[in-house]
Design a protein with these regions (language model features):
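Eukaryote-biased recognition of intrinsically disordered, low-complexity regulatory segments
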Residues: 1-21
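Ferredoxin-type iron-sulfur electron-transfer modules in oxidoreductases and energy-metabolism complexes
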Residues: 29-43, 86-231
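Active-site phosphate-binding and catalytic loops of NTP-dependent enzymes
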Residues: 43-49
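A generic structural motif
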Residues: 75-76
Length: 231
């Protein structure tokens, strides 16, 4: 297969460029990350992130033939012979396929991604019924790969103001958690023209999520909570 890979080293390159690599790979059970590792063996100057190789850590997210995804779970057999790889859009490029995730994680941390409960700690865990626990399905599985937020035009335009699909999915994860006591505080923080309401239900986030999650649905639930509180 042939990989056209975005290359950019700010220490020596005046501007980015694309470079082609030929890789011989048995496509039967191989993933795109395997091809990238082979490219790295040919040219050790190329840079990309990787870790778990199992679609759990989210570190090898990149733009694959114009669509964000994880290289480690993208089957070579499902790809054309010519594959174009670029860094995730909308974030500053550090080098080659590595982007600066600072703004993404700044927005994530801004929603206070942890249970806030001021009751005295129980002897064991804070209890939930099976039904209450099921409300978190489709929310907690997010691996923070940033595929969704970097596919969102609203995040491209206002990354410093709009929380983004990933952050808002996690915001609703804690709003939906019956153990959390900070509902009013969380809604006050999100009731803003930019932080929440820059979402225009374009739904690119749903299309690219490698875990099959639905950030748009979670965002709409937050909007519903704000409307119910207002009336």
């Amino acid at each position: 297969m042939r990989l056209s890979i975005y290359r950019y080293d700010p220490d020596k390159d005046a501007k980015p460029y694309m470079k082609d690599y030929e890789v011989a790979l048995d496509s039967h059970d191989r993933m795109l990350l395997d091809a990238l590792v082979k490219v790295k063996a040919q040219d050790d100057s190329i840079s990309f992130r990787r870790s778990c190789r199992e679609g759990v850590c989210g570190s090898d997210a990149m733009n694959i033939n114009g669509r964000n995804g994880l290289a480690c779970i993208m089957k070579v057999a499902d790809l054309p012979e010519h594959v174009t790889l670029r860094p995730l859009p909308g974030l500053p490029v550090i080098r080659d396929l590595i982007v600066d995730m600072t703004q993404f994680f700044k927005q994530y941390h801004s929603i206070k991604p942890y249970v806030i409960n001021n009751d005295p700690p129980p002897e064991r865990e804070r209890m939930q019924s099976p039904e209450e626990r099921e409300e978190l399905d489709g929310l907690y599985e997010c691996i923070l790969c940033a595929c969704c937020s970097t596919a969102c035009p609203s995040f491209w335009w206002n990354p410093d103001k709009f929380v983004g699909p990933a952050g808002l999915l996690q915001a609703y994860r804690f709003l939906a958690d019956t153990r959390d006591q900070a509902t009013a505080e969380r809604l006050d923080d999100l009731n803003d023209p930019y932080r929440l309401f820059r979402c225009h239900t374009i739904m690119n986030c749903v299309d690219v999520c490698p875990k099959g999650l639905n950030p748009t649905k979670a965002i709409n639930h937050i909007k519903e909570l704000l409307v119910k509180r207002a009336v």
